[in-house]
Amino acid sequence: APWNGPLFPTKDLYLFLSVFSGGVVSYWLNVGIGLGAVVAAALVGVLAGTLLPVYAVPLYCGSFVGMASPKVLTAGHVVLASAIAGAIYVLAQDVFNGFGGKLGTIACAGCVLTAAFSGKALLTGTVPPADVASRMIITSVIAAVAAYLVNVRLGKGAVMGSAIVGLVGGLVLPALIPDIGATLATVCICASFAGMSSKARIPNEALMALAGVLVGLVFVYSSPYMGGAGGKLGTTAFGSVIAV
């Protein structure tokens, strides 16, 4: 039957505004306050899950836009990227549900499209050496399983599962391992996105550990590409979860 309702239902407007707000606030915490991308996004997730659980998912989605590097996207660019991500979120709200990393993929699309429209080049990097890569993969497995446990076993939900693990990693790892702690914190929150998967998609911890291995491997070997784009980490997790 043809749709006779409003062109943009109120529910969708609230979802759009949640994604948009999450992006702007996360970028402000990340760059304006100087908390860094991992802590900023995780903090938005924890606050959203605690204070606004009904809109925690779109707010957390937006927070990934705010993880963008200021070397790639300025505050003005993030406003546009957040709006694009909000529109994509509304359009994609009924597909790929339960797959960890979906939200980051939406955010990444907003950031990459904004960078393309603005003529901004994404950052490049190098593949880390084997000793660092091995620690990254171990971190990825632990973070993915930990987020899954909080999400599914403890019943706290996907947003809190990921955000708690990301916040702990973002605060603890740089202090604990000064030389590569910041990198491991990034891996930690990346893998936590895989842990957002529902039990229907990833039924047990063993398969989540496998997803964590894949996230770690993809993270390591994608290091030279798409740097500075908010949502790249979620895209990494999304592909890994689908592969499992």
Where are these regions (language model features)?
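Intrinsically disordered, low-complexity regions flanking or connecting the multi-pass transmembrane cores
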Residues: 1-4
